[in-house]
Structure formats: structure tokens, C-alpha cells
């Protein structure tokens, strides 16, 4: 019984350790934060907190559909390097992603 109790206590910790997603907000025609460092294979969750549509792309890696206010886009980075995430709709929006 004691082992079962300890196992149940550890389950939430194990679940949290597997979460490899970070949240990037799109607000005020900007990505926030504007620069991140992540591990290869990690996922970034882009949340549109503006009142208009956004989109995200990295040349040669991904190009998303348009997303309205409150919508979310999840993208992973399978290669190491430094990448610039942009928005086709708002070309001044830039996020630098360093993938280790």
C-alpha cells in the first residue's frame, strides 16, 4: 500500500518532466519573448493574444495557416541551429529561436 501511495505521488512529477512545450505570445504585432533557447525536438506553442489574425513560418521548416484571436499553433524544432520565426501578415514580427 505504501508503494502505491509513493507511485501516485510521483506520477504528476513524471508527467511534468515530459512536457517540452514553451508558450510564445503574439501580441501588439510582436512575439513575446522575442528570443528563446530550446532543445532539439522541443515544441513552441504560439498563442494569438491579439484581436486580429496572425500566422507563423520559418523558411524551409514550417508555414502555418492563419490563426484568429485566441487560437494556438504548436511547432517543434527538429534541427539544431538558429532560426527566425516570422509572420507573413505582419513582416516586422520576428522571433529568434536558438535550438541546441
Language model segments and positions:
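Positively charged n-region of N-terminal signal peptides that target proteins for export
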Residues: 1-4
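Extracytoplasmic copper-binding redox domains, predominantly the cupredoxin/blue-copper superfamily
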Residues: 8, 15-100
Amino acid at each position: 500500500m505504501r508503494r502505491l501511495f509513493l507511485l501516485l505521488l510521483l506520477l504528476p512529477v513524471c508527467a511534468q518532466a515530459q512536457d517540452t512545450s514553451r508558450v510564445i505570445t503574439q501580441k501588439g504585432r510582436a512575439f513575446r519573448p522575442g528570443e528563446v533557447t530550446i532543445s532539439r525536438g522541443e515544441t513552441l506553442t504560439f498563442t494569438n493574444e491579439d484581436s486580429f489574425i496572425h500566422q507563423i513560418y520559418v523558411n524551409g521548416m514550417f508555414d502555418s495557416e492563419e490563426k484568429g484571436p485566441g487560437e494556438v499553433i504548436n511547432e517543434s524544432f527538429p534541427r539544431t541551429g538558429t532560426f527566425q520565426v516570422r509572420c507573413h501578415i505582419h513582416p516586422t514580427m520576428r522571433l529568434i529561436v536558438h535550438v541546441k
